[in-house]
Amino acid sequence: MGSTQSVSGTPARPLPRNKHVSRVADPRSPSAGIQRTPIQVESSPQPNPPAEQLNSLKQAQDPDPRSPTLGIARTPMKISGPDSQCPLVKELSEVFETEVSETEVSESISSPVLGLPQETPLSSELDLPPDPDPQVSLEDQLLPWSQTELNSKQVFAKEEAKQSTETMVSGQTSDKPSRDPETPQSSGSKRSRRKTNNKVLGRSPLTILQDDNSPGTLTLRQGKRPSALSENVKDLKEGVILGTGRFLKAGGGAWEQNEDHDKENQHFALMES
């Protein structure tokens, strides 16, 4: 068989060499010859910036305590200088201060003149006699109010008593026979109604509970109506049958319907076949 180590007979071909791909670390990249990314682009030589620009950049990159991310100055810093106020604001503030000072001076001048009439009421108050007893005066003022309240309460109680007596008398004297006996009432009213019905009608209390719709009582709607057949049977029993097919009632009643037809037939001769 063969040996353990196999050696190729043909020499290996060298890798293809491309001048664009020679600078790329990984030649398997699809964009090997296209310089797109900053990694692939060679750094161009840049001139050194002056020292003034470096200082300005450092000042701009100073951490802003108001920024949520330190090292990034996003909001502009407020310039706080000695002359930050507008000249118009200064003028207005000065005018306002002068007006306030003038008003204070005028008030201080007018205060001694106005002091005399303020003291005059004090002398008039001293002339008035003091109240002898403040508690007694308060009680005197409260007495008429309490008396009026008591009078109103008494009148209200009397009116309520009158209304209650009137309702009791009207409930005892008034009788309502048209009211349905099954309607709910108090026990006293039920007993009084049953007693009066027993005396007047002479029936037992159970008969009061029977209405028109109860099965125990017969009304005109529930009664039996006489039928035509029953009337004919009665007529046959009471009447006398004649030979011509018509009958006359025993009491000499009226002729039946067949009578008219028989009268018409009497004018013509009977045909015998």
From Swiss-Prot:
Residues 90-124 are annotated as: F-box-like. It comes from the Eukaryota. Ubiquitinated and degraded by the APC/C-Cdh1 complex. GO terms for biological process: cell division; protein ubiquitination. A motif (KEN box) lies at residues 263-265. Residues 32-45, 144-154, 164-175, 210-220 have a biased composition (Polar residues). GO terms for cellular component: adherens junction; cytosol. F-box-like protein which is required for entry into mitosis. Acts by participating in E3 ligase complexes that mediate the ubiquitination and degradation of WEE1 kinase at G2/M phase. The keyword Cell cycle applies. This is Cell division cycle-associated protein 3. The gene is Cdca3. Keywords: Cell cycle, Cell division, Cytoplasm, Mitosis, Phosphoprotein, Ubl conjugation, Ubl conjugation pathway. The modification Phosphoserine is found at S29, S31, S44, S67, S93, S204, S214. It is found in: Cytoplasm, Cytosol. Residues 1-231, 251-273 are annotated as: Disordered. Pathway: Protein modification; protein ubiquitination.
